Amino acid sequence: MNGRDEALRGVPRFSLCLPACGREIAVEVLLLKPGVHVSIYDGDAPHIGAVAIIDPAGSLMVNEFPGHRDGVICRHWADRFNAERFHPAVIECGIHYDGITREGIQEVVSVTDDMLEVVVQRIASVLIEPNQS
């Protein structure tokens, strides 16, 4: 077992994949003590296009890299996590589909909204009490 495997041993985590535009979007969640780390990615070129950070007090910051639009999804997830008091948290998103249409973008946003609902329910079921910092 390498050091990374050892470090993650015992950390609650789960993942979810749902289809969008002929591919799957993946979400991976790590429940840290305290904190939540979420990665949302896939499409034709999974990457990191935006990162949202919620500090322990609930202050929110979103950084979207130039040329990317992933901040919309990051902000939406971060706003919901903040409302649920799931902080501190880091949410990173990188979804890219070559030649995506406006309808395809709407499908990706809709699917990530559905995924958000599942993730919030899963986190709430694992946490005894959200961080009240």
Each predicted region: which residue ranges?
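A positional/architectural concept
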Residues: 1-2
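Conserved mixed alpha/beta catalytic, RNA-binding, or beta-rich assembly cores of soluble enzyme
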Residues: 8-84, 88-97, 102-126, 131-132
